[in-house]
Amino acid sequence: MSSTTSSSRSDLEKVPVPQVTPRDSDSDKGSLSPEPSTLEAQSSEKPPHHIFTRSRKLQMVCIVSLAAIFSPLSSNIYFPALDDVSKSLNISMSLATLTITVYMIVQGLAPSFWGSMSDATGRRPVFIGTFIVYLVANIALAESKNYGELMAFRALQAAGSAATISIGAGVIGDITNSEERGSLVGIFGGVRMLGQGIGPVFGGIFTQYLGYRSIFWFLTIAGGVSLLSILVLLPETLRPIAGNGTVKLNGIHKPFIYTITGQTGVVEGAQPEAKKTKTSWKSVFAPLTFLVEKDVFITLFFGSIVYTVWSMVTSSTTDLFSEVYGLSSLDIGLTFLGNGFGCMSGSYLVGYLMDYNHRLTEREYCEKHGYPAGTRVNLKSHPDFPIEVARMRNTWWVIAIFIVTVALYGVSLRTHLAVPIILQYFIAFCSTGLFTINSALVIDLYPGASASATAVNNLMRCLLGAGGVAIVQPILDALKPDYTFLLLAGITLVMTPLLYVEDRWGPGWRHARERRLKAKANGN
């Protein structure tokens, strides 16, 4: 028990008693902001958000990130094989590309079901179930004999792999506060996006030397290893089941390692802080109601526009590079390294910048409200904290670079191969950086349903992205690369004012929603 108490104290937020009188301007800060004189009392009464140490949280983030690799990996590893699939099954390149579109559609739809289920039944059961679906799909793909089977099992593959992103985000939402969430979401995105870098390289190697079917056997083996790590090491984190880590886990919610080591930090008689929700068809579709919230819709829609443009760049790479530069499957796979490294570095860097920006916004908030320097602030303790401002400080320079590089990408195909690869790096860096900001903000807006919120995010991205991938080839045929990517840059530029709208009016919309939900919960 003593070790548990020590761990709890180390994680407990320490908020000092203010020794200064709040400024007159504090009078207009609203009822959502706690009085400074009550901060110490609040912190002494509240248990830590989660008892896991920083290193333990990092370990769990790595496990769920490696699991989430399989959603982008299963899509991107397939890109260099498109030409071989077309020839092997005697179909056109457009039909081969359609298998990517189908994958992305299901990739968008499936997490809405799995995410809400994991918010109700737990993260581990859904993780395990979806991975079993994924492994079965890969075995079937490796043995598929015709185009119909390939399409059907690609859809099943997407249904199994896509949920790993929303469930992984749910795990992060369960164990983190807003002030530490940015860097962990960045790590989650960076490790996950490793699939963007290594996927096409592996796909090119397998296709060149072993045939495209070997891709699916590789995914079966790698997916099995990831499933094993979840079974052995990942505990249940859903707060209505596991609480803040002090509730004893049993059955499927208990990782195999606890059978050997025991579960540390358990408090006798500890109960979850929230009630477990029931799974129903209503709960499955409930996350779609998030889209009627103005701040959520704007955040998701703009992120989806960027995702669509990025998807159109990557999905057209195989055909463009093969036609313009005459590259083989292996060489095309290697050209995706720029895109992959851009994804990883963008997610890592922007994730850590978000934590820095959170601290910067904390200081500004404390100065405005008369709190002492060093006061830790998050949405749970201070609901009026401007999380939108904290998350979106990096957005402006990131989107500016994204628009410029997309506009130049089509023209770059007339130059040396290195130029479009470098531009792909910056396009991927900026797009993934924006996804990281987008993902963290969505979790902040719905912290109690982070998996469902992430699933809706994934739904909008993938449906718009699938539409973009489906039409990119006809647009390229009609406008040629120069004007195609200039058009995409222009569309992004036109949508950019949405960022100002979210920054300016988002906090007010969030406060109104919180008051409405609180009144509904109280039966008013």
From Swiss-Prot:
SUPFAM superfamilies: MFS general substrate transporter. Glycans are attached at residues 90, 244. It is found in: Cell membrane. Disruption phenotype: Decreases concentration of citric acid and increases concentration of oxalic acid in growth medium. GO terms for biological process: citrate transport; export across plasma membrane. Residues 1-49 are annotated as: Disordered. PROSITE patterns: MFS. The chain crosses the membrane at residues 60-80, 95-115, 125-145, 155-175, 186-206, 215-235, 296-316, 332-352, 395-415, 417-437, 459-479, 481-501. The keyword Glycoprotein applies. GO terms for cellular component: plasma membrane. Gene3D superfamilies: MFS general substrate transporter like domains (1.20.1250.20). Keywords: Cell membrane, Glycoprotein, Membrane, Transmembrane, Transmembrane helix, Transport. The keyword Signal does not apply. Residues 34-45 have a biased composition (Polar residues). It catalyses: citrate(in) = citrate(out). GO terms for molecular function: citrate transmembrane transporter activity. It holds the Pfam family MFS_1. It is a multi-pass membrane protein. Transmembrane transporter that exports citrate across the cell membrane. Belongs to the major facilitator superfamily. This is Citrate exporter 1. The gene is cex1.
